[in-house]
Amino acid sequence: MYPTSHEHHLSIHENSELKNIKPQQKVLGCFLIVLSIAFSDVRDLFQIFSHIFLVFYILSLTKIPAKTYLKRLTLDIPFVLFALFLPFLSSENNDKIFEIFSFNVYQTGVNDMFTILFKATLGLTVGIILTGVTSSMEIIYGLQKLRIPNIIIAIMSFTIRYIDVFIDEFKRVKISMASRGYVEKGLKTLIPIAFASGALLIRGYERGERVYLSMISRGFNGNIDFKSRNYKVSNKFNFCVILSIVILLLYKIL
């Protein structure tokens, strides 16, 4: 696998059991788990606790530090804030449960709140698991092995590279502003940030164009090639994926 400077942004380089299994296996497995969570019914306690146990068991296999997990879980805050208002809303049915400070709490709103909290939190946790034990380029490699169209693979690969370009340019702009004595004080100091943002966009675009032209000069023809390496098999991860699908199928059949 080609090493890249952006691999460390999300991936946790630990001796995890899931670190060295095939990327396509991790991508497909996480997708199936998220699919099972998305189609599960929050009114079924067996499904809820089964999926919670499976997801957090897989999380324990990754050996991601709790502090890192909680920090990345903050992406769930907008969904949590949105879900907290749902109990006070109702669809067409006037299914009021009780009243709090002149605000009516409805059963449909409570159900929607638990649905969002359950699915969004577990879905994000699965995403944290995947990105924690798989580098960005390995994810693209796994998608390529899953026969995703080459145009999508190329777009994702360029996106990752250009994000890294913009991060580097942002660091340079920040250092240059600090060397010129820039200090953030009040709204007036936001004007230099606006100018710097425009310059950052232009410089990032120019650098991205140079990267693309250099790839063309080296024989790039639109196909992304990756070097494969030896991977291991995790029976525990495979069992959790299969069990997640079985739980969903049993609920749909029964």
Name each model-derived stretch.
Residues 44-45, 65-66, 148-152:
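Membrane-helix interface segments
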Residues 50-57, 138-142:
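Hydrophobic transmembrane alpha-helix segments characteristic of membrane transport
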Residues 1-43, 53-62, 168-254:
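Transmembrane alpha-helix interface motif
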Residues 72-183:
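Juxtamembrane/interface alpha-helical elements of multi-pass membrane proteins
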Residues 43-50, 68-72:
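Short, aromatic-rich membrane-interface segments at the entry and exit
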Residues 15, 19, 63-68, 100, ...:
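Membrane-helix interfacial "entry" motifs
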